[in-house]
């Protein structure tokens, strides 16, 4: 959720550290800080709020030194104040930390009983005090680091400076952390994209690893203190891509990138020339499995729900899907089959824990991820990249539709492998997928004016209801989630057939009801539900040309999209939902790219 960077080398580092934090802003944060060491003395600057505030602090009181660590913080333990911002200092020890120390209360009581005086409300400070205690007890720096790691529990990434060692950064992970190799200098980052301005040669630590980093190299140890080797690899992270271009926000840019990135993603899985599935769609033996488990969180979970409809209907493959935070606690009776995990970052803590749970039970693991260098990708048997490129806005847009595109291609591969679709049906499906990017471009180029008018009206509402049937139900949930995330309106979403089971009581003349209803096999039933709503609510109907002609309902507004094949409808119909949320948030003046309390990558449970 936070960002860590570190540099040890031969040039002044304070400004470079702040620059390295900038690509990590997309993760979300509420304070920032930097620490350097010069002439054997630790020094730091911290600021509440954005990096601009930290830059002002550094402008007023610059930091010197060729070694340092820096951090952006999302408050978990303790308020988002300068006092609670990292780095934390204790007796010649400086610490920055991502994640949660789960046993911090127990450790804090123990340390306080021994005389430790805590200056902050954070869990991180116990790490600094533990290290200081072990140094007082006579342990060397490495021994103190190892002893501390034996005591703390949780998912974390750490970077540490010792005041009596002016040439070394120590680091540890049970969460994302990468080491960058430079020319006479070394780098540390919680995301390879932070290191992209400096190097593309990366070593990824694995859970339990800790490292001693000097300007000419790194020594890596496992949890037991044994020296280990981790491979270097060339990272594809590209800092120059993290740019809004001519758009007001990253979210707007990413919405309009969808036709291009979906074309790239589809090209990886289907051959649009001969209209057939590529071998990448066969990385899981769909012909041999009797069932499929899917686990994911947030928007990825909603993509997974749509995937469940597709796999079950078109490939006749039973799917068990659960939110990752609940998945392993349900103790699902897992057969030795396959499991699919969906995550943009590939670092989502709950999803990663579910992946490891399934792996321990002998399942073959597939990962649908955007970050091909992520922990989830590295721990999976088969990786299905969504190829969306960097997504900076916290609210998922292009990652969602690319996840759907990949799941649609996998569904085609599964249907082919299981003999549930014919060769002609495979070709028709891939023809529809191949046409999708152009249709998405047409929609994005045509609907913005009417979306802006609707969004201005929605910005005055406190509540909005979203309805859908079939795959349009998860899409309704996704539309509500997008509006909730970035506008702070409180939308609700339901299966259209559930109106009379409670939700109908919410509807009055002031409530907009957004109904997603392509003219599919569910359309007539959805129209019946809309007739009930029309007696008291204001309907915004999102449908296609055939649906608009057939509905004959008095609506507040009807958004008419092209008539498309059922398999690509979720991707096409997601576009007005994304734009409605975006423009509503813009009219309300919220922080669209970094909404309050939310982070791009949730790396703690």
UniProtKB/Swiss-Prot annotation:
BP-aspect Gene Ontology terms: carbohydrate metabolic process; fructose 6-phosphate metabolic process; protein N-linked glycosylation; UDP-N-acetylglucosamine metabolic process
Source lineage: Bacteria, Pseudomonadati, Pseudomonadota, Alphaproteobacteria, Hyphomicrobiales
Catalytic residues, chain numbering: 2, 600
Expression triggers: In response to a plant signal such as luteolin via the regulatory gene NodD.
Subcellular localization: Cytoplasm
InterPro entries for this protein: GATase_2_dom (IPR017932), GFAT (IPR005855), GFAT_N (IPR047084), GlmS/AgaS_SIS (IPR035466), GlmS/FrlB_SIS (IPR035490), Ntn_hydrolases_N (IPR029055), SIS_dom (IPR001347), SIS_dom_sf (IPR046348)
Chief location: cytoplasm
Protein name: Glutamine--fructose-6-phosphate aminotransferase [isomerizing]
Domain SIS: 280-420, 454-595
Catalytic activity, EC: 2.6.1.16
Cellular-component GO terms for this entry: cytosol
Swiss-Prot/TrEMBL catalytic activity: D-fructose 6-phosphate + L-glutamine = D-glucosamine 6-phosphate + L-glutamate
Keyword tags: Aminotransferase, Cytoplasm, Glutamine amidotransferase, Nodulation, Plasmid, Repeat, Transferase
PROSITE patterns, A to Z: GATASE_TYPE_2 (PS51278), SIS (PS51464)
Organism name: Rhizobium meliloti (Ensifer meliloti)
HAMAP family: GlmS
EC class name: transferase
Signal peptide: none
Domain Glutamine amidotransferase type-2: start-end pairs: 2-216
């Amino acid at each position: 959720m936070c960002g860590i960077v570190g540099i040890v080398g031969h040039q002044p580092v304070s400004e470079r550290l702040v620059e390295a934090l900038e690509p990590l802003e997309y993760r979300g944060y509420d304070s920032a800080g930097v620490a350097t060491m010069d002439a054997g003395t630790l020094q730091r600057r911290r600021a509440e709020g954005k990096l601009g505030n930290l830059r002002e602090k550094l402008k007023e009181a610059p930091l010197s030194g060729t070694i340092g660590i820096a951090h952006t913080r999302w408050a978990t333990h303790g308020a988002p104040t300068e006092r609670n911002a990292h780095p934390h200092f204790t007796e010649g020890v400086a610490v920055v930390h991502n994640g949660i120390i789960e046993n911090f209360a127990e450790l804090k009581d123990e340390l306080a009983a021994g005389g430790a005086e805590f200056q902050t409300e954070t869990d991180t400070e116990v790490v600094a005090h533990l290290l200081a205690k072990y140094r007082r007890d006579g342990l060397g720096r490495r021994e103190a680091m190892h002893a501390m790691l034996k005591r703390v529990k949780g998912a974390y990434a750490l970077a540490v400076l010792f005041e009596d060692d002016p040439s070394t950064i120590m680091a540890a992970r049970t969460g994302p952390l990468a080491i960058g190799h430079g020319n006479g200098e070394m780098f540390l980052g919680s995301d390879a994209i932070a290191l992209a301005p400096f190097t593309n040669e990366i070593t990824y630590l694995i859970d339990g690893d800790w490292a001693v980093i000097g300007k000419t190299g790194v020594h890596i140890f496992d949890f037991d203190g044994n020296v280990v080797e981790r491979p270097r690899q060339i990272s594809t992270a590209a800092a120059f891509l993290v740019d809004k271009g001519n758009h007001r926000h990253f979210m707007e840019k990413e919405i309009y990138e969808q036709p291009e990135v979906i074309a790239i993603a589809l090209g990886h899985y289907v051959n649009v020339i001969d209209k057939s599935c590529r071998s990448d769609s066969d990385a899981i033996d769909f012909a041999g499995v009797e069932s499929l488990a899917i686990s994911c969180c947030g928007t990825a979970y909603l993509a997974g729900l749509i995937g469940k409809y597709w796999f079950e209907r078109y490939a006749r493959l039973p799917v068990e899907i659960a939110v990752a935070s609940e998945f392993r606690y349900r103790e699902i009776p897992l057969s030795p089959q396959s499991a699919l995990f969906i995550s943009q970052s590939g670092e989502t803590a709950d999803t990663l824990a579910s992946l490891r749970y399934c792996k321990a039970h002998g399942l073959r693991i597939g990962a649908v991820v955007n970050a091909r260098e992520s922990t989830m990708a590295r721990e999976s048997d088969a990786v299905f990249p969504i190829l969306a490129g960097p997504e900076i806005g916290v609210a998922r847009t292009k990652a969602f539709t690319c996840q759907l595109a990949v799941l649609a291609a996998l569904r085609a591969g599964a249907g082919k492998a299981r003999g549930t679709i014919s060769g002609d049906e495979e070709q028709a499906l891939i023809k529809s997928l191949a046409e999708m990017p152009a249709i998405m471009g047409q929609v994005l180029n045509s609907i913005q004016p009417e979306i802006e008018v609707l969004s201005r009206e929605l910005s005055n509402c406190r509540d909005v209801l979203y309805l859908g049937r079939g795959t349009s139900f998860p899409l309704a949930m996704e539309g509500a989630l997008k509006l909730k995330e970035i506008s702070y309106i409180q939308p609700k979403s339901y299966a259209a057939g559930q109106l009379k089971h409670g939700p109908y009581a919410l509807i009055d003349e002031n409530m907009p009801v957004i109904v997603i209803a392509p003219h599919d096999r569910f359309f007539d039933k959805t129209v019946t539900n809309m007739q009930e709503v029309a007696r008291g609510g204001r309907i915004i109907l999102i449908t296609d040309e055939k649906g608009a002609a057939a509905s004959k309902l008095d609506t507040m507004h009807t958004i008419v999209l092209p008539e498309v094949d059922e398999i690509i409808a979720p991707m096409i119909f997601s576009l007005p939902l994304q734009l409605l949320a975006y423009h509503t948030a813009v009219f309300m003046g919220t922080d669209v790219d970094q909404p309050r309390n939310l982070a791009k990558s949730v790396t703690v449970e």
